[in-house]
């Protein structure tokens, strides 16, 4: 009898457990609780100009007489000394290498940003000049010699660290990041979307790496100490920039 009672109790427990599991799978358990949200940023002092959109840039500069120029590759080499900090905006596309911007790139940026931005809450500003450097070309099938070719088009040189487009207003990074990232991918040099705080943090990290570097064999010390007569194969450009640039390319791992 005791064995029969135990078996009955076990079978009843199994059946009740199965019923509970079936009920729990079909029923939705509702619960209420407290949730803390982040305080939204204050945009009271945000500056909004009368014309918030990017203006049209001329394809050809308004010169009385167009003059041909040499290549002057130093225009895209090394760090930028102008337009490398924010003025009025909070977010920007920053160049991480040197290169030439054509008028087609500028039109692509202008049309993409102007179509997708909200002019009531944000504004965009150019941080580059219109194309001004002439590039010459010769037609196909011409013989060697005969002097420099005719001017074909104009470009704008860009160096590492220069801001291309700046965006500001009553806006957060999540609202404009996808627009600026889409534009940055199409540029002829590596570029990145950064905020004011990100740019300051990047400069601060570079300065901290230089200050707390424990490796005594840095490029700067080796080059300035002329170890093994290294100075005879180094250019003044490499010595001036402590080997952080090879032409238009930036080497972030160098300290």
Which positions does each model-derived feature cover?
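Ribosome-associated RNA-binding proteins
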Residues: 1-255
